[in-house]
Amino acid sequence: MNLKIRTFSMALAAMSATSYMYALPSNNIEEKSSTKEKKSLNLEEESVEKNKKEERNVMLNAADANKPREIQIGLPSEDVTVYENGLPAVYSSSVHKLSAHWRGDASLKGTDLMTPSESAIATGNIAYAVSSFSELGQKEFKGKLNYKANHFGMQNFDLNLSGGIGTNWLYTASMYQNFDPGSFKLRFTDYADRTQIYHFGLTRILNEGKGRISLLYKYSNSKNPGNFANAAPFIYAGDGSIKKIAGFDPGMNSYVQRQGSFQYLNTKTGKMETWNMTDGSENHANEIALISQYQFDNGWLWKFNAKYMNAPRANYVDYGGSSISEVSEADGYQLSDGSAYSGLIEGRRTWLHIGKVSNALMTTEISKQLNNHKLMIGLNEWYYHLDYYSSSFQWAGTVEPYPRTLSQMYVNPLDPTQTARRSETFGYNELSPEYTKGSENKLAVYFTDEWKVTPK
């Protein structure tokens, strides 16, 4: 039995925007200590190949400590692509966010970084990409436990248990729990990021270790209102620095309005509805994956990976702002109690994104080392279905911690009388609302020849 606590960290002055760096390949000591056994199962070729590469670093995004850093290189790619067992962790992060379904947690055996050229050949995406591999298990029992906390009250629990069943079966089970209240209190919820992800898997060893086939299940459930809460007013000094606005401390004060709901016009139904701030950031998905490989006697290595993922809720909220100005009572802005307001205000914009996502992905490759040439032929068949719409509205708020929403005279275009009435929201769906329902299919064949000209 080998139970090992992998990581324990207590941050005394941590912010949610702190970036971390992972040095790769990961778990190097553990992998070296178990190389003999891996060879007997023929499961080691991926880690061996990665050890031969120069080390590459994967840095987490400075704006989000739960996903890789987005690196813009001036070529068409929507964001950083993350692959899990040779397939996209999420097909597109524009609706179903990567951090809602994938974390660099204890369920992973290791990670690697693909260059734009490698990613372009294998996937068609021209971008730096993170390639991750699941922990499948080994003959002996192993446990990995990571725990992180900070003085704001964040706690993160990350556990993996794996081992063997009999001679030819392996198992793995993982649990990821994140309780992050953020660096300031959100009055409408307890956590800026409440994410839970579970993994379960069984692996069958084939033909005395020449191959394996694994069935993996994943469930993710994430609520991340911190995605729209990370905003703050400031004064731009003109030299690249900012100055604080009196009474507001960026990063420590909340710029999310104090009341818990808004009226908006639903793009899909055409009706006025109420958005409660506790809703709108929910994501949950179920995924089942089949990953396999087999080493033939003639030297050819065949890999076949496939998965189906269904996310019936893939929602998020965007906030935007504009310039800050000062108004007087004569400008007609009122607080919720009907009193006239004078002082600083900012025009705010809000987008509500509601989506349902599903995809079926398959990738197969066959490769062989021929002298100083490594040949590989691959096939991708990726299907993606999206049912998505967004609604937008505008509002004006005070410039202070927990802003108050201000009402003003507004003519609702849906009002047949076209009478001006006092309203806290306006400009319904004037800011790029969208409705999309459809599917996309990608079929690709690729061939590579990695020619090592000299032994060095």
Please provide the spans of the model-predicted regions:
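Transmembrane beta-barrel wall of Gram-negative outer-membrane proteins
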Residues: K142, A149-D180, F184-Y255, G280, ...
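Outer-membrane beta-barrel proteins
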Residues: N156, D180-L186, S222-F228, W302, ...
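Acidic, small-polar-rich N-terminal luminal/periplasmic segments of exported/outer-membrane proteins
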Residues: L24-E140
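Transmembrane beta-strands of outer-membrane beta-barrel proteins
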Residues: F141-L145, Y171-A173, G211-L215, W302-A306, ...
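Face-selective signature of the C-terminal outer-membrane beta-barrel domain
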Residues: N283-P312, S342-K456
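Short sequence motifs at beta-strands and strand-loop junctions characteristic
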Residues: L113, A122-G124, N150-G153, D190-T195, ...
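Outer-membrane beta-barrel pore domains and translocons
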Residues: P116, F133, N146-N150, Y176-N178, ...
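Acidic/polar loop-and-plug regions of large Gram-negative outer-membrane beta-barrel proteins
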Residues: I205, R212-A289, A314-L352, Q408-E430
